[in-house]
Amino acid sequence: MPSVLVTGASRGIGLAITRHLSARGWDVYATARSAADVSALGQLPHVHPVQLDVTDRAAVAGLPEHLPARLDAVVNNAGIIVQGPVESLALDDLSRQLDVNVTSQIAVVQAVLPQLRKARGRVVFMSSVSGLITLPGTGAYSASKYALESLADALRMELRPWRLPVSLIEPGPTRTDMWGGALDDYDRMTDRLSPAHRELYAAHLAGNRKLLGRMQKLAGDPDKVVKAVDRALTSRHPRRRYRCDHVSRAQLAFLAVTPTSLSDAVFAAATTSTR
């Protein structure tokens, strides 16, 4: 029975991946931060829950003790979203965005690579179309995904001598609890802004909120993301990148043939409300 480590497995895409792989006969070592989530994961067949905060360096360094000597794959799924105009970003929030979405993912890979080498295993990173496209208000999140894309590319080439594939999953908006609560999160972010920034960016904040509502309606099926992860783990020749929805592909196709000045104007208009 193959074994896989899935981080951020307690909800959303991570939980869907965990359920799918356990049903397919994988031994899933699934991480979650809270004791309650660990307990819930423990009720699933073939799932071995591990309580872990991926930003806890000592805990991540000790992660191999909770895993089998031979590990067939790791799916780096843990992540958060920090929203807001760059001018108003709290630097601590920006640091946490990069820590959770970038540094901690690399820390996990560094910790388990010896076990992956024994199995000639695979590395999968949960990236995003936001690692290829940046919209106003998404600078921090996009920065984390752009960084992850670059690090994954470097890692893929560096691991070639051991034939360890590295794949990036690049979904767009997906129907999960994270996206379901996106408007509430956005409103909390807006409430935390200073009055001056709220006034300066009023049109942008209102426009971005409308866009979020539209994107929630267009959010894709999480099954498509789960199937992309499955292919990355089981295909004889896994792809370097898996794009999961038509909306994201259309956006990328638009960017490929559009001058930056025009795409900037289009994206700025899409995230600005005139009333």
Feature map (PLM): residue ranges:
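Residue(s) in the substrate-gating loop at a strand-loop-helix junction
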Residues: S128
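Active-site helix of classical SDR
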Residues: V109, S144-A147
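Conserved glycine-rich cofactor-binding loop
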Residues: S10-R11
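The beta1-alpha1 cofactor-binding region of Rossmann-like NAD(H)/NADP(H)-dependent oxidoreductases
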Residues: L52-G62, L91
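C-terminal beta-strand-loop-alpha-helix "lid" module of Rossmann-like NAD(P)-dependent dehydrogenases
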Residues: P161-G213
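Conserved NAD(P)H cofactor-binding loop of Rossmann-fold oxidoreductase domains
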Residues: N77-V82
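Substrate-binding pocket helix/loop in short-chain dehydrogenase/reductase
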Residues: P85-V86, D93-S95
